[in-house]
């Protein structure tokens, strides 16, 4: 870090933290706060060179932003070929990733994380994994990067409370779309 004034620092080293998780291929990433002072922070959410230096080599083709309100549960969605990078920009949500590859030894195993604008965590979700989120704050804004365009034919939906997956959610009666209710 470099001092640039009273109560003001710049992180010029791009100190990104990458952690493996219990699920093969799923990564938990903490991007660096580049600048912090009495006005707030500036976080570098994505820097292609830094991600590539850390072995995250994807050609992202689509960035989307999603908003939801408290107790909305979206998911669990996925497909056979897309990698996603999920980032919470405002609020907080309970995020679940589940292995949906029947040929993999971790099939039906899942892991959860809390993503928020405070902890800055990102989750890298590989192909053949479903993911879903439950909004815990009043509202949430999150972004996701995709390395492939939407392909309806390769999509799958896992019912949020499917007993075969036995996923724990913090509430029992979330707000669901028709698609997510049906699974």
Where are these regions (language model features)?
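Acidic, Ala/Val/Gly-enriched low-complexity intrinsically disordered segments
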Residues: 3-4
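Non-catalytic, conserved peripheral segments adjacent to functional cores
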Residues: 15-118, 139, 146-183
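Conserved metal-binding segment of the jelly-roll/cupin
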Residues: 115-138
């Amino acid at each position: 870090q470099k001092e640039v004034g009273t109560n003001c620092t710049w992180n010029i080293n791009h100190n990104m933290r990458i952690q493996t998780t219990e699920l093969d291929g799923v990564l938990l990433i903490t991007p660096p706060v580049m600048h912090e002072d009495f006005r707030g922070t500036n976080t570098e959410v994505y820097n292609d060179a830094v991600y590539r230096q850390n072995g995250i080599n994807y050609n992202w083709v689509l960035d989307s932003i999603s908003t939801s309100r408290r107790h909305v549960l979206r998911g669990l969605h996925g497909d056979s070929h897309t990698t996603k990078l999920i980032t919470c920009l405002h609020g907080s949500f309970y995020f679940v990733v589940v292995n949906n590859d029947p040929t993999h030894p971790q099939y039906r195993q899942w892991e959860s994380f809390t993503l928020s604008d405070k902890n800055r965590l990102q989750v890298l979700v590989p192909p053949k994994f479903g993911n879903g989120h439950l909004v815990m704050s009043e509202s949430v804004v999150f972004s996701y990067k995709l390395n492939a365009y939407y392909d309806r034919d390769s999509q799958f939906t896992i019912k949020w409370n499917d007993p075969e997956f036995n996923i724990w959610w913090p509430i029992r009666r979330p707000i669901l779309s028709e698609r997510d209710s049906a699974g």
